Amino acid sequence: RDLVRSRGLGDVYKRQPQPFVGWVPFGNVTVQDADPCFDRNPHYVRVVNDGRLLRAGLDNEGYRGIGVKQGEEYRFSVYARTPDAKPMKLSIELVNSNAQNLLKKEIEVSGNNWQKLTAVLKSPFTDAHARLRILLETRGTVDMDHISLFPVNTWKGRENGLRADLAQALYDLNPGVFRFPGGCIIEGNSLETRYQWKNSVGPVENRPLNENRWNYTFKHKAFPDYFQTLGLGYFEYFLLSEDLGAEPLPVISCGLSCQYESNEVVPMLSLIHISEPT
């Protein structure tokens, strides 16, 4: 999985109004939605270095820390633009759990059209609780969206791929059938939050965020930042089934939300497409 938490930057589900989940902004950093990079994830961040503040940028804490290993490579990517079209310099840093900056790489943003920028970071240290830091070094403005830090070493070497050791363990089991993505996760707490497979294919950056089924199941056990980015979706599951040599068994919504949580039902006429050939 991606090591960055909330890589969509500002795209949050409506029950969680906090736009910087997983992030610590510093300096002049705001959430914007004018002329977005992705129509289904329309929010992005604008970072402004006005020349007076020492720093302007963001830190990402990952999932209780970003786990990195010495000598391993990690692919950083970001979609960025400069509203005034002037070349801007971003520094990408890996910071260890002692707040020491042990790796720094610079990339240049130029042009007022969205573009994907990438860099491979080779970690010089091992730490279970590292952080990713992005700084705007040049005076000016940069818009950023979908910031990602992904291990280069994945199953079959695929970008946005699976953890190699876990996928290998599945392969070694020699399964005949692979069922995905699960059971209750399909239902959702409501029809609005049910798992809709069409949202889990296509460009990863434009797969809409969805609430997780167990986000608010119990009032005394609420996890307001527990969401599905759908970075692992039907496309990746079918690829894995093919790699495993297993028969894929996809689970789809039958038009019922979790009947323990709600009594919502999709009208029968809306389900005709499930049974009729196209």
Where do the PLM segments sit?
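Extracellular carbohydrate recognition and processing domains
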Residues: 97-127
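Extracellular beta-strand ligand-recognition surfaces/modules
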Residues: 117-149
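Extracellular glycan-recognition surfaces and repeat-rich motifs
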Residues: 7, 11-45
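Structural recognition of the beta-strand scaffold that forms the well-ordered cores
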Residues: 176-180, 248-252
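Aromatic- and acidic-residue-enriched carbohydrate-binding clefts of CAZyme catalytic domains
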Residues: 31-43, 186-232, 261-271, 275
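Extra-cytoplasmic beta-strand recognition segments
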Residues: 7, 11, 45, 54-90, ...
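An active-site-proximal structural segment forming one wall of the substrate-binding cleft
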Residues: 124, 154, 158-175, 229-244, ...
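Single conserved hydrophobic/aromatic residue that forms the stacking wall/gate
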Residues: 2-13, 272-278
